[in-house]
Amino acid sequence: MKRVLSTSLSVALATGLYGISFGAIGVAAGLDVLSVMLLSLLMFSGASQFAFVGVVSAGGAPITAIASAWLMGVRNSFYALRLAPEFGPRGLMRFLQAQLTIDESNAVSAAQVGSSDRKLGFWLTGIGVFTFWNLATLLGAIGGNLIGSVEAWGLDAAAAAAFLGLLWPRLRENLPLAFAGGIVALAAVPFLPAGLPILLAAAVALLPIGRKK
């Protein structure tokens, strides 16, 4: 139990602190503190949140931002399929587990041996990340407001940079597909509203380009 607790706490703290970046970047994208906090409280998926503010900062339509966030968060559904048979949540616990089903809680849970440790790892990590992430988001959002002009500090480009940072490890796994998506997105920029090119690039990811057989 001590090992699970230690692992969960360290993962939760390290991941949660990254929320400072999201808070500051969300404000830089033009959102107010309340909107930034609602994203962390309700959406609670780092990649999806960065995708959302990335589209917003580029001037994209809200529906495009929502679609981008959904595409980034769809993997959590597959985590839920793995966890549901063992956890078997009912009632309100089902909604709580769904909210806490993220990369970190799934990873810590999967690394444990016994069923009780897997459940403990999931809940401790999920609750820990949720707590630290939201506290850090608040600090980042308030700090972003105190900075003043985000353009003067170069933070207006931070959302796109953070989004790319999240994607880069996966892009390296299939460079031909990444380049194809990039070319499609760049070609679409002059003709489509902001935010739609990235959705076209995501569609390219479904093509069998450069995949290992």
Where are these regions (language model features)?
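Helix-loop-helix junctions within the multi-pass membrane cores of secondary transporters/permeases
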Residues: I66-D156
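Pore-lining transmembrane helices
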Residues: S6-A98, S116, P197
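Entry/N-cap segments of selected transmembrane alpha helices
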Residues: L5-G16, M37, G126, F130, ...
